[in-house]
Every structure is written in C-alpha cells, then in structure tokens.
A protein has these predicted regions:
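Membrane topogenic/interface segments and analogous intrinsically disordered interaction regions
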Residues: 1-258
Length: 258
C-alpha cells in the first residue's frame, strides 16, 4: 500500500515537473519570437515612433512639437514603442505557444473552438487598436487642441506621457473589441445562458459608461468613443452567440415528455 502511494506521488511529481519544463520552453520560444522581431525593427525605431505619434503631431498647430523632459526619454520611448509593435507582430506565435501548451488537456470539441477564438481574438484586438489610432486619437486631440487657442495656451506634450496615454488607450480599445468573443465563450461553454445575457443588457450599458469614465480622459467625447462601441460590440456578441448555443443532451430533451 505504501509502495503504491509512493509510486503514485512520484508519478504526480514527474508529471508536474514535465509540465513545468514544457511551460518554460514555451515561454522562452514566445520571448525569442518577440526579441527577434524587435531586433529586426530596432533600426527603424525613430520612424516607428514618429508614425506612432502622428495623430498628436497632426493636431498640433504649425511648428508645434513634442517635448522630452527626461534625459533618456528620447532613446527609451522609441524603444518601448518598437517593443510594443514587436509584441503585436509576434502575438500569433505567442498564442500558438499557449495553445500548444494547453491543447493536450482539452476535449476535442474544445480544441475545435480554440482556433477560431484565437484568430478572432487577435483580429478584433488589432481592429480595436486601429480604431483608437485612426479615429479616437485624431478626434480627441483635435477636440483638446481647439480649447487651447482661446486660452492662448500652447499644447506641448511630453513623449513619455504620450506613450503612457497611447498604450492605455490601445489596451482599453483592444480589450473592448474582445467583448463579442467573451460573450460567445460564455454562451458556448454553458456558463451563462443567452437569455440571461440579454436580460442584463441595461446593466452592461451602464457598466460600459462606467468603465469608459475610468480608463479614458475626463471628457465626454472620449467616454462616448469607448462606451458606444463597447455596447454595440456586446449586441454583436449576442447575435453571434445565437449560432453557438449548446444543444441540449438527449436526456434533457426527453425530460419534458416524461
């Protein structure tokens, strides 16, 4: 009896260590993918940052410039932006490593669901960032700049502050555009019935405005630009989730007849 328990404990320990080593290897491969892309892009770091800052630069008055208040800011900020771009480009590899690690523990029907979820999640995240870059940034910056002229103030933004603002906004809109995926997963896995998600629609709308008030600048325009898409994407998720409502088992289907 003791020998059997010892053998079982030894097997569990070996299994845990093998999973731990595999996780380490997957993390290393994902990190290497990001580093390789970063090294390939680092030469163009100033150009990447200029493109990154273009929405703000275009809103500045003629001759307006961004400023640097930190001695190392002009070097590290473009590097951070380039690292962000490298992460986005390498994200499919990162997702694949995550998928390869968890796939052996999933059922067949769960594996079939993972691939479309990963592809749609990545696509929607990129669309969310593009929405922020091409629509939200120009709209907000021009709106803010219009208030400076009557005050006789000149808008000169520090590049480090701009980086923090832009990354927070990118993350907020990227996650916001994941709402349809979250809704579909909740319905498909049977965690929340579709009818319940429809029932809590008013609370979701209120929550969207609360979240937008927290993560966006304190102006109504920015909050609307986040809250309205979040609400519409929730509705889109409800529509798509209708296709993924789990079918009742034979026993559940036959129970009313009993």
């Amino acid at each position: 009896m003791t020998d059997n328990n010892a053998t079982e404990d030894s097997g569990l320990q070996e299994s845990f260590l093998s999973h731990l080593f595999e996780l380490r290897d997957r993390v290393i491969k994902a990190a290497l993918a990001i580093i390789i892309v970063f090294v390939c892009l680092v030469y163009w770091a100033p150009d990447i940052f200029h493109l990154f800052a273009q929405p703000l630069l275009s809103a500045l008055p003629a001759g307006g410039k961004m400023i640097v208040t930190d001695v190392t800011g002009s070097f590290f900020v473009p590097m951070k932006v380039t690292m962000l771009v490298a992460f986005i480009i390498a994200l499919p590899v990162v997702m694949y490593q995550l998928w390869a690690f968890i796939a052996p523990g999933l059922y067949l029907h769960e594996r079939k669901l993972i691939l479309p979820l990963v592809v749609s999640s990545y696509t929607l995240f990129i669309i969310g960032m593009a929405f922020a870059y091409f629509l939200v940034f120009p709209t907000v910056f021009k709106f803010m700049a219009s208030y400076n002229a009557p005050l006789g103030a000149e808008m000169s933004t520090d590049i480090d502050n701009y980086l923090s603002f832009a990354m927070t906004t990118f993350l907020a809109f990227g996650i916001t555009f994941e709402v349809p995926v979250v809704v579909v997963v909740l319905v498909r896995m049977g965690m929340v019935p579709l009818a319940k998600l429809r029932e809590i629609r008013p609370y979701v709308i209120v929550g969207a405005f609360v979240i937008s008030a927290i993560v966006t600048p304190p102006d109504v325009l920015s909050q609307l630009l986040l809250a309205v898409p979040m609400t519409l994407l929730y509705e889109l998720g409800l529509l798509v989730a209708r296709l993924y409502v789990p079918k009742p088992s034979e026993d559940e289907a036959a129970s009313p007849a009993d």
